[in-house]
A protein has these predicted regions:
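Edge beta-strand at a domain terminus
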Residues: 32-36, 77-86, 120-149
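Tryptophan-anchored aromatic micro-motifs
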Residues: 30-56, 82-84
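Hydrophobic residues embedded in beta-strands of well-ordered beta-sheets
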Residues: 66-68, 89-91, 113-119, 126-127
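An anionic, turn-rich surface loop/hairpin at beta-sheet edges
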Residues: 89-112
Length: 149
C-alpha cells in the first residue's frame, strides 16, 4: 500500500470516528433534554392547532399567570388558568369562573421547540394538537389577536 493510500485510509477512519462521536453527543443531549422535561415538565408557551381540521387553536402562556385559551371551530373562545399536577406534563385547565374544563397531556416538545404534540381530554373525547409557534397568541373580545411577544 502506498503512502497516498495510507493517508486516505487514515483520513477516512478519522472522519468516521469524528462523525460517530458527534452523533453520540447529539443523541446524549437529546436524551438528557427528554429526561429533564419528563421530570420537570416541557415548556409549553405557544399556540397549537388540532391535527384533524386545524380549526381549533389552543394557546398557553405560563409566565402570565398560567393562562390558556381555546378558540373553537366557530370562532368562540374559552379562557382560563392551568395548573401542573404532580406529573408536570399533565395540566388541569380551569375556565375563568373556576369550573374545570379539561386535562392536557404534553406528549413532547422538541429541544429546539420547533415540534411538539399535546392531547386535550374533555367531554369524554381526546383531541391531538401540534405546536405551531412558541409565540403565544390570544384572541380578545373584539376578535383581534393579542400577540404576547
Amino acid at each position: 500500500m502506498g503512502r497516498r493510500a495510507t493517508s486516505i485510509t487514515l483520513a477516512v477512519v478519522c472522519l468516521a470516528v469524528l462523525l460517530g462521536a458527534t452523533g453520540l453527543f447529539a443523541i446524549s443531549r437529546e436524551t438528557s433534554y427528554m429526561q429533564e422535561c419528563a421530570s420537570e415538565g416541557f415548556a409549553i408557551d405557544g399556540y397549537y392547532r388540532d391535527d384533524k381540521t386545524s380549526l381549533e387553536i389552543l394557546a398557553f402562556l405560563e409566565e402570565d399567570g398560567c393562562r390558556w385559551q381555546l378558540v373553537n371551530k366557530d370562532g368562540s373562545s374559552v379562557d382560563g388558568q392551568f395548573k401542573r399536577t404532580d406529573d408536570p406534563n399533565i395540566l388541569i385547565l380551569k375556565k375563568e369562573n373556576g369550573e374545570e374544563f379539561g386535562t392536557i397531556h404534553v406528549a413532547y416538545i422538541s429541544r429546539r421547540r420547533d415540534q411538539g404534540q399535546l392531547y386535550l381530554f374533555r367531554d369524554s373525547k381526546v383531541t391531538r394538537f401540534y405546536l405551531v409557534s412558541t409565540k403565544p397568541a390570544f384572541t380578545v373580545e373584539s376578535g383581534d389577536v393579542d400577540a404576547d411577544v
